[in-house]
Every structure is written in structure tokens, then in C-alpha cells.
UniProtKB/Swiss-Prot annotation:
Source organism of this protein record: Morus indica
Keyword Membrane: yes
Major location category of this protein: plastid
Protein name (record): NAD(P)H-quinone oxidoreductase subunit 5, chloroplastic
Subunit structure, as described in the record: NDH is composed of at least 16 different subunits, 5 of which are encoded in the nucleus.
A GO-annotated cellular component: chloroplast thylakoid membrane
Gene coding for it: ndhF
Function, in words: NDH shuttles electrons from NAD(P)H:plastoquinone, via FMN and iron-sulfur (Fe-S) centers, to quinones in the photosynthetic chain and possibly in a chloroplast respiratory chain. The immediate electron acceptor for the enzyme in this species is believed to be plastoquinone. Couples the redox reaction to proton translocation, and thus conserves the redox energy in a proton gradient.
NCBIfam families named in the record: NDH_I_L, PRK06590.1
Amino acid sequence: MEYIYQYFWIITFISLPVPILIGVGLLLFPTATKSLRRMWVFPSVLLLSIIMLFSTYLAIQQVNNPSIYLSIWSWTINNDFSLEFGYLVDPLTSIMLILITTVGILVLIYSDNYMSHDQGYLRFFAYMSFFNTSMVGLVTSSNLIQIYFFWELVGMCSYLLIGFWFTRPTAANACQKAFVTNRVGDFGLLLGILGFYWITGSLEFRDLFEIFNNLVYNNEVNLLFATLCAFLLFAGAIAKSAQFPLHVWLPDAMEGPTPISALIHAATMVAAGIFLGARLLPLFIVMPYIMNLIALLGIITLLLGATLAFAQKDIKRGLAYSTMSQLGYMMLALGMGSYRAALFHLITHAYSKALLFLGSGSIIHSMESIVGYSPDKSQNLVLMGGLKKHVPITKTSFLLGTLSLCGIPPLGCFWSKDEILNDSWLYSPIFAIIAFSTAGLTAFYMFRIYLLTFEGHLNLYFQTYSGKKRSSVYSISLWGREEQKWIKTKFRLLPLLTMNNNKKTSFFFKKKYLINRNVRNLRGPIITIPNPNFGTKNSFSYPHESENTMLFSMLVLGLFTLFIGIIGIPFFNQEGIQLDILTKLLTPSINLLYQNKKNLMDWDWYEFITNATYSVSIASFGILIASFLYNPGYSSLQNFNLFNSFVKGISKKLKFFEDKIINVTYDWSYNRGYIDFFYATFLIQGIRILSELIHFFDRQVIDGITNGVGISSFFVGEGIKYVGVGRISSYLLVYISYVLIFLLIYSRGVLFFL
């Protein structure tokens, strides 16, 4: 075991040769490298699999014999300063390594087929391998300087991957937005690192925690300054994990390829902020204000992310806001001091969300066979529907991930989320109510995505547009408008939601259906899609199931989603003590954080089942509401007079709710809570106005003074030149004038004092 720890540093660089060899091959042998491009997936998966095997072995050893291993190399600059590099192997490192490698391997296998037709295939795998190397280096770092170095490499990889299709303006803008937003948090992280080095004189985690805790307990540190430094450290986690108010980059980051969203923005990079918070929790836990702030930002983020997911018509953006909300749960757990619950939810959510993103990629892949490569169409929930008949395996996998994220037992996220909800009651009843309510909102928007995608009929073929007349009504989806427009046509919302989508409609009739103007350009391709099987332009193609390599990754992630919760479920050992795998693995970290370990490891089944009943009931209610609004099966109820009279009664009595509250909710959600508008209007425009004022001041005032002195000197010189004409009488006149002026001033001053 000691031998493995001794050479553990090699793990960090195992996958680094892949991007290097791809780069050298493209530079020296471009033709041969591109012709053999599909072979590069094998070394990428192989090297990452080696890291996974080592990580799994280390995790098993730590479960059997809990320990922490630290190795450091010192590079002395002078007698007063030295740089130390090393690696830290503890339970948190093992968990993150297994998470990064398992999801990374499955995403690489998935990407081999998903990106096979892309010209940037080799560039994609080079970026992905370099990103995996950076993440492995980040989680094995033994000090803050190493973390910051790999932190920046991860940010650079994120920039490259989000802007992978850099010729698209939206992708180019998205990667710039992500880069700039994360630089705000990274600048705070750097200042926090420098601040704690000034306080403690060390950046090694072991020394940093010990020295700082002693300073706090002995009241030898300025707590205000220490709190400020801790907040600056946490600012890096806020930006990287898309927490309010630095969350604005995450939905735009969906402009990258879908496998990137699954790896970076579900399982690893956004989880890096949670990792940093967990790594520095021994530092934060002695400062109650910071812990309360972390919990507050977490509760705001989880609620905000859930509400912003309501109106997203892009399937990937909806999942992005879901990620933001679930990361809020993890931040809330860290703020409450629930170290185990935060990491448990980090694990379960990573596999469930990766499954959902890969499922969405399979859906997009199948839709592109109809609409072509057009993200505005292939990712549009309004144009989907009825896909369960065409992509049954994808549908089952997506449903599994959806149920897990909703917190339905016995799937993974049920166990971890309920543990956070249980702890929230002990921390703050208000926070608990918000967290429980958000569980219902999560179930609502996730099943909204599922129902709009898989139930009913393929809306792409049911929606046509005639002429250039602009429709002012809603599309089929409640939250499906492209942009906000005031509705001039009077209609009731509930009859629209329950309209019958099951009616058989012939495409050869001239009957038209109203749809948003933004998809009017689809009328050509929809009508004239050729079908090679029938040889006619009037035959329609339909989505198809993805290739086996893509389905394999989804099936494996589905198994993880089903069974990953087992690691956090307590069982009775031979001594009758309740103990689970995760708690046993985290024993060294729990001992470091808490002295009273026994209370933390006890599991009250009665309390858990009681809270689980509440949470599952709330989630079921959210699913029921989503099914009522979006499931086409409920449209058959409109044929009953009782239901029609009920709808009419609601329309008359709750007109304000229907026309105002729902529209306000839609506007809030569709416009991203007006936060982007606030930044664009006040922050960006304010900076531009300030820069223009500075430019004006520099040109007119600063340059005006210097230029004015020069011009004044010129005119004075010119005036003196004309005075000095060589006549003594002129010189005497000027001399006498200055003397008289001096005497006049002097005499007035003397009289004033007399």
C-alpha cells in the first residue's frame, strides 16, 4: 500500500500524453493523424480507466483502513520563502477521482459516436483529455497554490470546450461570458489565498487548518479580516459552481457539444466548487458568519434555479438550471455543516444528471435526422413530443434520471436529497420549508421536460405556418414562446393546455395550426423531406434510436443511478452499530471536522421515513401538476361536460390568476429572473459610461492642462517676442510698469495692516 501511495503522483499525468500526441500529430503529420482519428478514443479511455482502477483500489483500502496520506516536495527560494508541491490522498480525493473517471470514461465512449461526423473530432478529444488531467490534478492538490494552478487550467478547458464551435456567434459569446464570469470568482480566490498566507504563513492544508484554528481559539486574529478572506476564497466556488449571483454563465455554456455538458457542467467542473468548499470546510467551520452565508447563498440558488427552469424551451438549458438548483442543495448542506450529506448528493446527482444530459444528447441526435443541424430546432421542446415510440431506450433512461432527480425512492438522489432536507429542519425551519417546496418545483419542471419530449405526438409535424402573419398566442407548450409579446387575442389558458393532441390529422389537408413565428421556416423541410424507403417527398422521416456506443454509456449510468444510493444507506454490522460505506470512508474527514462523531453517525429511521414521506408527497404533487398541464392523456377530459364547466368556472373566477400571475411567472422565468438584464443594463452599461467619462476626463482635462500649458507658453513667448524689438525705451517702459504694479500692491498691503 505504501508503494502505491509513493508513486501516486503519476496518476495526475497519466492521461496527459493524449492531448500532447494529438497536438504533435496534427502539427507534423496532419493527414495521417486525421485519417486515423477514430483510434484516439482508445488511448483516452484506456488511460482514464487506469486512473479509475487505482482510485477504486485506494477507496476500498480507505474503507477497510481509514487514513490520510500526504507527500510534499519543497523548492526553497530563499531562507524565508519556499514553494511546496505534493499530493494529498484522503477520502475526498478518492470520491472525486472515482466520480471524474467513471463519468469521464462513459462520456468519452459516448462522444466517439456523437462527434464522429464533426471536423473537430481530434480537437474535441484533446480538450477532453486535457480537462480530465486538470481535474485529477485539482482534486489531488495538497495546497492552495496547486489548487489555484489547476483551477485556472480547468477554467481554460471550459472556455475551449464551451466555445468548441467557435464559428457560431452564440458559442463564441457563451465561452467569453463563462470566462469573464469565472475570472471574477478566481480573482477573489487569489486574494483569499494571499490573505490566508499573510495570516498563517502557510498554504498547506494541514498547517493552514491547524494554525488558523489555534489563532481563532486564542483570539489572536482579526476575525473581520479573516471572514473577508474566507469569503474571497468562497467566491471562487460561487463562480465555478454557478451559485447566485455568478450563475449567469451556466445556461449559456450549453452552446457546447452535449457530451461536454454531461462531463463538465453536471459531474465534474461545476462540482469543483463543491469540492473546494468541502476541502476548506475545516477552515470555514470556525467562522459562523461564513457558514451562514454559504447556507444562505445555497438556499437562494436552489430556489432561483428551480423557478428559472420553468420557461426554458431548450432541453439543455432546462437541465442547466436544474444543475444550478441541485448545486444549491449541496451548498446548503455545506453551510449547515452536513459534510457527508453534501458529498452524498454530489455523487448521486453527478450520475443522474450525466444520464439526463447524455439522454438529451441522444434526443438531439435523433431530432437532427429530421430538422438538420440546427440547435434552435433540434433542442426545442416545442417541436418534440411522442418520442417514446421512436427512442424507447433513451426514453427509459431519461425517465430513470428524471425520477431520481425528483427524489423518488429507491433511486440515488432520493437518499441524498432527503438527508439534506432532514438536516435543514435542524438548521432553520424557514430554510427547510424552502428546500421542501423546491423539491416539488424540481419534480414539476423535470416532468415538464419529460412529458413535452416523449408524450403525445411529434409536434414538429403537427405545427405548420401559413404566410407572414405573426401569431400572438402561445405555442403548444405553456412556456414555449421565443420572445415576450403582449397577447392581444383573448383566450383562456386552461383550454389551451388541455387541447386534444390525440386527434388524427392528415398532412395532405390544407388545415393550418397556429405556431410561433420563429419556426415558420420549418414549413419547407417538413413537407419536402425525402424518404428513401418510399421514394416520395410526401413521406415523413421520424427520429431514430442512437447507436449502441451511446446507449451503452446511458445504460451504465442508469445502473449507477439505480444503485449508487446503497453507499449511503446504513446497515447493522456484527456489533449492532449502524454504519454505511460512505460514512466509513469519510471517517478521517469527519474526525477532523467534528469531535462528537457518534451523534453524526446515528441514523434515526423513524425521522428519516417521516421526512421522506413529506418530500415524496411534495414531489408526487409536482409530478401530478406537470402531468395535468402537459400530458396529452388529460386532454380527453375536455370531452366531459363536468370538466368543461369546471374549466369555465375557473376561467371566470380566477381570471386574475390566469392572466396575471401565470404570465408574471413566465416572464420571470423566461427572462432569467431579470438578472442578466440587470447586469447588462446597470453593470455593463455602467462600466461603459464610466469608461467614456474617464476617456473624456483624460482627453479634455488631463491632456487639456498639459496642452494648455504648452499653448499658453507659445502665446506668451510670441507676445514677449514682439515687445523685445531692441529699443531701450520699450524695455524701460515695461520695467517701470512692473515696478509701479509692485509698489501699488505693496502700499495697499501696508495700508491694510495699519
